[in-house]
Structures are given as structure tokens and as C-alpha cells.
Amino acid sequence: RAGTRGDDASENELARRAEALVSEDERTELMGNATRLISRAFARTVLMRYDEDARDARDVTFAYGARGKPSVRGPATLAARCGFSVSHCDGLTAVAVTTNGDACGIDVEDENRRIGTDVGKFARRWLSDDETRRLSDIVADDERARAFMRLWTAKESYVKASGLGIAGRPFREFDIAWDVAEDAAKTWSMDLRDVTDDGTVPWRFALLKPRASQSHVMSLCAPAGADGRMPRVRVRWASPFEPLVDVDAANGGVEYAAG
């Protein structure tokens, strides 16, 4: 898993470098959207590291499902081995990669983002009744707003992992129940309740802060491992087009939850 933040160079310079890593069709598609252009190129540079047949980031090509979910088209060895998902928010791009071919979904948001003065009104429109009720039980406004953003991020990661997207699986039609541990990190544990899910894919979640000093929060959704738990999550960090660096908890790779 990798994150990138464009603090060390101008967006225009990053976009110029990114253009060299996308196809002509992609340049046309992404014209005027530097963030998506950089994210697309960054995904290629991350994915190529997982396959020895990819000599250049441009060797990595993508296919898209009926609802827009991306997958690796080539090289064939990479397509068979890796599933991936991409999200970006306020200068941070997150790329999730599985190395066993499983699907995954990732979403990143600023947990300090405020959607308006009335979180409850927004929740009633978009979330399930149980989720809205649980949010309303949180007394402190800031804590309730942060909980909303974490929940939204988790739900987004699920619909991306499933390939359905928000249009195919409206947020109001499934629940994510959560508990908050009494530890210093206020660790969340989450349980998906989707009545249309046939149970063939036991989805698990990891809710992460890639760096403790920043307000971004990421949710990763992927199938459970052999032990029924979330597979091991490895967090890596990079500036755009630079080598990836492993991040451990002591250096800011803080994990909110994995369950």
C-alpha cells in the first residue's frame, strides 16, 4: 500500500512528469485534471514494482469494469497476481495492492473535513438508519463529524472492493457497525452487515492513519485471510515518482482498526 503527497514539487511539474507515463487516450481523458493524472501515473509506478516483467511503468495497462472499477490488464503475470484500488484527497494519493489476485477497495479522506453544520441531516440522507442513530449518540460535535468521515471512508472502500460503486450499492442499503476500544488510539473494529451479500466473500476492513501528524484517514477493504482476519497490511510512503519507503507505527503508520 502506498501514499504520495505532492509537497516537494509543484502540481504542474508533477503533471508534466505524469503525462509521460499515460497513454494518449488517457491524456485526453484526464486533460485539466492534474490530480487524477498524477494518481493514474503513480498507480503505474507502484504496480510495476510487483512484477519483474514490467520494465517500465508504461508497460502496466488497465481495464475497467461495467461500473468503472479498474483492474490490471497487462502484463499478464501482474494481472494474475495483483488486485488494486486508488483514491486521492487533498494532495494524498493512496494505492492499495493485493499480491494474491484478490479484489480490494481503498478510500482516503480528511477526517477533519466538515460537510456542513448538521452532520445528522447529511447522515439521514446517505447512511442507514442504524448508522445514523449511532452517530446521533455521539455527543461531541467534532467527534461525531470525525466518526462520520471514518464511516463514509469505510463504506466507500467496500463498494469499491465489490466493484459495485455507490450507484450499484447505495450507502443506505447496508450497515457498517463499529465499536471503539478504550485504548489511546480509540481503535475501531468494524462489522459489515449487507443483506444482499451472499457471504461468499468475507470482507474485512482496516482503518488507518498513514501518518499520525496528518488528518488523512484511509479505509482498506479486502477479503479475509485464511485465519478469517484482515490480511497483513504493509504501509509504504513516497513522494511522487520517488522510491517507496516502509512506514511503521513508531514513525506514524498508525492503525485505527483491522477486523
What would you call each of these model-derived segments?
Residues 1-259:
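Core catalytic alpha/beta fold that binds nucleotide/phospho-ligands
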